[in-house]
Curated annotation (Swiss-Prot):
Statement: the UniProt record of this protein carries the keyword Transferase: yes
Organism: Arthroderma benhamiae (strain ATCC MYA-4681 / CBS 112371) (Trichophyton mentagrophytes)
UniProt cross-references to InterPro entries, sorted A to Z: Aro_prenylTrfase, Aro_prenylTrfase_DMATS
Recorded family membership: Belongs to the tryptophan dimethylallyltransferase family.
Protein name: Prenyltransferase nscD
Pfam families recorded: Trp_DMAT
GO molecular function: prenyltransferase activity
Gene symbol of the encoding locus: nscD
Amino acid sequence: MTSVPIFESVSRFLPPANEDEKFWWKVTGRHMARMMHEAGYPEDRQVECLLFHRFKVVPCLGPRPHSDTPWYKSRVGGGAADGCPINYSWRFGTADRRPHIRNFIEPLGALTNTSADPLNEVATKALLHDYSMTLPNVDLEAFWTFAPHYRPRIIEKADMEKLAGASLLVGAEMSPDSHTIDIKAYMYPRVPSQTSQLLTTILPQAMRDAYGEDVCLDSLNFVHDFMTKDPQGCQLVLTGTTGIDCCKLQDTRVKIYVITRNTSFDHIAAIVTLGGRRPISEELLGQLKALWYELKGAPAELPSSEQLPVQTKPDGSKNPIVVPFYFDIQPRLALPDVKAYIDVSTSPVSDLAAANAVVCHLEQHGSGQNPRAYLNVLKDITPVEELETQKGALAFYSVAVKKNELDITSYFNPQVYKRYFAHEVQLNGQRRSVFE
C-alpha cells in the first residue's frame, strides 16, 4: 500500500471522528487520494475533493464492517459488488483531457434497513438537500419533480416488504480542472408495473411537469419507437433505472438504462448506432469489436453474428450474459446518445487481463494520458494476485463514441467486505477475529 502524501497531510489536521467514520476515511479516502494523484489532479483540487469526501461522503457510509458480511447489502456496484455502499469510476483521458474520477454511493442512515424507510430514501434525500445548500452548481428542481413519479403508490404491507431495497443512489464527479462537484441521482422504481410504464407514462409526464407542457419529447419518443419497432431495438428490456443530472434544468440529462441478452457483436453495433441512425466509422466499430471480444474472452474467429459462448459457473450452472446500455435523453436533441456497458464480472477473463486489455487498446490508438496510471490504482486497491485469480474488483467498462474516438470508463469496487480481513491487517497491523 503506497503512501499518498496529500492524504497523509490532510488526515493530520482533521478533527476527531467516530470509529465508523475513521474506518471509512482511512479506506475510501485513501482510495480517492490515490486515484486523483495518479490522474494528475492539481494539488489544490486534490485537497478540495478529499475534504468534500471526508465531510460530505464518509458520514453517509454507515457503520464500519465488523465481519465480511454486510449488515445492509447496497445496490452500488451491481452483481460484482460485495454490498459495500460505495464504488468508483475512472473515465480515461483523451489527448486533451485528463482522467475524471467519480464515486457512487448509497447513503445509509439511522432508518436504513428498517420498516420506517423500506426504500432507503431518507438518507439519500437528506444528502441531496445538503448538497443543494453547500454546492452552488447543484440544482434539484428536476430531481424533486421526477422523484414522486418513481415512488410506488400505496400498496399492501406484504408487497412492500417484498419490494424493500435501494431506490436511490448518488454519484459525485470530481473533474480535475473544475472547482465544482457535479452530482447525479439514480432512481430505481421498485414496482415491476412502473418499469413497463416508464416510456409511455412515467417519463413523459415527469418531463412535462419539469420542463412544461410544450417540452419536446422527440428523443424520448425515438427510444420508445426504437424499442417497439426496430428489429434490434425490440430485443432491449427496460431495467427501470433512470439517472438525472442535479444541475440547472436546461442542462439536465435523463439517462434510461436497458439490457439485452443478445450478445452478438452485430446486435451490439446496431444498438450503439441506433439502427444506423447514428453512424459510426468502420474504424471505430472495429475498435469496439476488438475490445468487446477481448474483454468477453471470445475467440477472434467467432463471427460477429454469433452469440458469445455461454459460461459455466463452478457449480455447473450457466452464467447468463446481459449487456446494459443507456440512452441519454435531452429535450433539445432529436436523437439520444448511447453508451454500452461491458460487464467483466461475468467474463472468463481475469480482472487484471481485462484492465491490461483496455490500457493496451488506449496505448495502441494513442488515446488517453498515461493510461497505465489506472493500473497503478487497481493494483494499489487490490493486490495483483487477487486481480489475477479472483473476480469482483472490476464491475463494468462503459464505451461511448465522443469526438471520433472511444470514450471508455472503468467502474470498480473497493471490496470492503470481501477484503475485510485484509483491511483489518492494513489498518490495525494484525488480523482480528470477527468475534472479538
